[in-house]
């Protein structure tokens, strides 16, 4: 089956339409003239936007929400006994999971760019969004964060270019059709699905092998897990790194907010220089990946430079949320030990007196499987406030808790306290912060609410 099957589809229903990826696909269909309906558990600004675009959306999942539907798309979080999914199966309505449907949307384009990696997918895809828009490629874009340049997280273009993130969870990126595949890094994560790091590496190897012979693999040369899997890939490989790779960054300097400037090097020659407006050394690597993709697409250096310099970050990626009594609040999506360390390192370069980190662990499985790594991740903070674990799709079995993590961190002499409500966190911050402090709100769940309360 190819993208052409959509010629026979008039109405698509999305179960879980409020998610960032599902809403983006729904918006693409609406702008292409399809009828769209959907359901979600709660209302949100994303849902309001889709309603304004013409979508028919229900709050709550009920069988009667399925009306004259040709196709149903559902997320991995939807349970098998979901009444809408049950009705679809009973009535022989075609169903697809989110990744499969995104793959079919991609299949209608010639130049599909899929950005994979345990960390940095949204930021790198966002950088590429700025570059491709500045290069007038008129791309279709689906990204996991909101961007000012496209007024949201989705852009519906009319060209052959399609740019999206490629998530490895449950091997969903194996449903894609990449012409250019990017692997930023490979780390242990999603261990509720993957058995171990070798299982994860095998999935990324399969992803790389999806790229056709005339396509490109963009890979970080400084990640040994990546180096292990790309040796027998049958396409053009472009590698990058700070000290290794075909394309390198040299003469790196940082301004007083931790944003880097650097020279882009190939074969020991300086190609051009770039100034970033997002902090952290990890964003130099993300920018290099974007530059390599640009080279594969023959994008001119002026568009690359302008695209990267015009990028000031995405929603919940080291995002400045506000200031209260000269206390700066920054929010970040970091929820894996590697991401936490990188974000705290970037925060160290930010002008502030003290760093107070508010962290909400994300899922019991991740907290349990990476427990020791979490205990080694918070040395660059003056005070750590731990919220309760955000369960997402999981149930609390009692095997791990934020209190357990806090106890271990305190034994390692980390100044850490456990607070169990957003109100308590906000009250603590109002009492303990001083002018010039930096409050860093971290996590992939709803911890942003604590920051919102503090800023009220």
From Swiss-Prot:
Chain sites annotated for binding ATP: 117-123
Question: Which pathway?
Answer: Cell wall biogenesis; peptidoglycan biosynthesis
| Cleavable signal peptide | none
Reaction(s) the record says it catalyses: UDP-N-acetyl-alpha-D-muramate + L-alanine + ATP = UDP-N-acetyl-alpha-D-muramoyl-L-alanine + ADP + phosphate + H(+)
EC numbers, comma separated? 6.3.2.8
Intrachain disulfide bonds: none
Which GO biological process categories is it annotated with?
Answer: cell division; cell wall organization; peptidoglycan biosynthetic process; regulation of cell shape
Q: Which family does it belong to?
A: Belongs to the MurCDEF family.
Q: What is this protein called?
A: UDP-N-acetylmuramate--L-alanine ligase
Organism equals Clostridium tetani (strain Massachusetts / E88)
């Amino acid at each position: 089956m190819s993208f052409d099957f959509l010629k026979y589809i008039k109405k698509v229903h999305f179960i879980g339409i409020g998610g960032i990826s599902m809403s983006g696909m729904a918006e693409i269909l609406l702008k292409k003239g399809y009828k769209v309906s959907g359901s979600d558990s709660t209302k949100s600004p994303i849902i309001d936007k889709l309603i304004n675009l013409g979508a028919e959306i229900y709050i709550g999942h009920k069988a009667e929400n399925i009306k004259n539907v040709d196709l149903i798309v559902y997320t991995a979080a939807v349970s098998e006994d979901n009444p809408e999914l049950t009705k679809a199966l009973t009535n022989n309505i075609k169903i697809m999971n989110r990744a499969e449907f995104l793959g079919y949307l991609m299949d209608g384009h010639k130049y599909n760019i899929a950005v994979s990696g345990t960390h940095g997918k949204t930021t790198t895809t966002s950088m590429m969004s700025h570059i491709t828009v500045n290069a007038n490629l008129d791309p279709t874009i689906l990204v996991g964060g909101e961007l000012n340049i496209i007024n949201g997280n989705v852009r519906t273009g009319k060209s052959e270019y399609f740019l999206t993130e490629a998530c490895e969870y449950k091997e969903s990126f194996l449903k894609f059709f990449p012409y250019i595949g990017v692997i930023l890094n490979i780390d242990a994560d999603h261990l509720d699905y993957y058995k171990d790091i070798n299982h994860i590496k095998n999935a990324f190897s399969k992803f790389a092998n999806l790229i056709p012979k005339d396509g490109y693999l963009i890979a970080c040369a400084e990640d040994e897990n990546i180096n292990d899997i790309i040796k027998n890939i049958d396409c053009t490989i472009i590698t990058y790194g700070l000290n290794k790779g075909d394309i390198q960054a040299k003469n790196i300097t940082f301004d007083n907010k931790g944003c880097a400037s650097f020279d882009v090097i190939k074969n020991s020659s300086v190609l051009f220089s770039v100034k970033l407006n997002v902090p952290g050394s990890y964003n130099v690597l993300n920018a290099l990946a974007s530059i390599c993709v640009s080279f594969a697409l023959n994008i001119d250096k002026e568009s690359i430079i302008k695209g990267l310099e015009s990028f000031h970050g995405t929603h919940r990626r080291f995002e400045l949320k506000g200031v209260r009594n000269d206390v700066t609040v920054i929010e970040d999506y970091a929820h894996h030990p590697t991401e936490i360390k990188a974000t705290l390192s970037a925060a160290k370069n930010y002008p502030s007196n003290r760093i107070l980190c508010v962290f909400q662990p994300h899922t019991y499985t991740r907290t349990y499987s990476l427990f020791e790594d979490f205990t080694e991740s918070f040395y660059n903070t003056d005070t750590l406030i731990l919220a309760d674990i955000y369960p997402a799709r999981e149930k609390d079995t009692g095997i791990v808790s934020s209190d357990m993590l806090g106890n271990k961190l305190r034994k390692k002499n980390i100044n850490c306290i456990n607070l169990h409500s957003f109100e308590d966190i906000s009250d603590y911050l109002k009492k303990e912060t001083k002018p010039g402090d930096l409050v860093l709100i971290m996590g992939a769940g709803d911890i942003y609410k604590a920051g919102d309360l503090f800023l009220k």
